[in-house]
Amino acid sequence: MLHLTASSSGDKPTVVLVHGAFAESSSWNGVVDRLLGDGFPVVAVANPLRGVQADADYLAGLLEGIEGPVVLVGHSYGGIVIGQAAEGNDRVAALVFIGGYALDVGETAAGLTGQYEGGTLGETLVAFDLPGGAKDLYIAQDKYRAQFSADVSELESARMAATQRPIVESALNEPVRAATWKTIPSWFLFGELDKNIPVALHRFMAERAGARRTVELAGGSHSVGIPEAAQVTELIEEAAAATVLATAGDA
């Protein structure tokens, strides 16, 4: 059971960071360092990447052990997970999508992405068979930087490629059951040159969600949150200030 409470850090909400496919929780390190320095409790979740409902259930269970208000932050597929896990949890004050999917009920990551030009992820994937007939997907290491992290240093990209965690293929085709961005305030940040999620799709999702603020970073890759950790942190703290901290100040 976690005991990270808002009251332990001057009534600031706990920020829960959820990575997506082909990454892992250390991808948030630059953001974690800044948030901790600013007095925010933080949890960088190890997203199982086993399926939308399974991952959302995992996150929802983790949230039960965190006291006080929460700001959920999702990168890539992690955006799908936060959008579903927040269903029925009135302590989730804000959703922040960092190069992340904000899907509507019935939509899938693969299905919606396929409606837009510019995504090249499929060309880079390597599949491995799992017992029972399922498949795990990785990005081929020699294609990783160009596809996923072109604005990250060569050394760091190589490290990310080596430590990436796979996603089960079926997760990308699993329909979403909840779209909490319709009722929870949302913020969006993404890179102009994202090759996983085309920029036109990012713009569509942010506009559809009625985002409080949308930040589009010129030259940014799908992993734009790593080199631009300061801007990501600023947006998260803005979301906290506009929701949790604003309410506390009015009390």
Describe every region a protein language model picked out.
Residues 11-52, 70, 88:
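Conserved HGGG/HGGXW glycine-rich cap/lid loop of the alpha/beta-hydrolase fold
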Residues 54-70:
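Conserved acidic catalytic loop of the alpha/beta-hydrolase fold
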Residues 73-78, 82:
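Gly/Ala-rich beta-loop-alpha elbow adjacent to hydrolase catalytic centers
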Residues 91-92, 96-131, 168-172:
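Flexible "cap/lid" loop of the alpha/beta hydrolase fold
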Residues 133-180:
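Conserved alpha/beta-hydrolase catalytic His-Asp/Glu region
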Residues 155, 165-209, 213-229:
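Conserved serine/cysteine hydrolase catalytic core
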Residues 213-251:
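Catalytic active-site module of serine/aspartate enzymes centered on a nucleophile-bearing elbow/loop
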